[in-house]
Amino acid sequence: MPPRLIVFDLDYTLWPLHVDCSVTPPLRKDSKGRIVDLHGQKVRVFPDVPEILERLKREQYALGVASRTDDPDTARQLLGLLDWNKYFSYQEIYPGCKVGHFNKFASRSGIPYKDMLFFDDEHRNIRDVSKLGTSHSSTCSGG
């Protein structure tokens, strides 16, 4: 049975950086439409991610993001600049154990943990959330 909610971590899962220490906010688009930080450093995503998100949306999966970042504002800003908010109906972006994030997903969506699939690059997050009964996959530090 396919998952009813697919949840992604952000840092080193959807993009190859930590938003709380790898870039300097504010982020913006430059004259060529590239996303850059305060110093002009380009901010990139893993190459296959946009196509994957578009396909999942087309196939009508519910999607969420769960991030423990210490800079939720910059993470949200990057999601907005990428125009990715359209993909993620559920967003829990704040420091803390991801069990709390998933408790909110279950409460807000009505979807049981067993029907959620979680992608993350950090084993501790996968270990914590798997105790709830979610399915999971490690991204091996990216993409």
Predicted regions and their residues:
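Short helix-loop-beta connector
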Residues: 1, 112-113
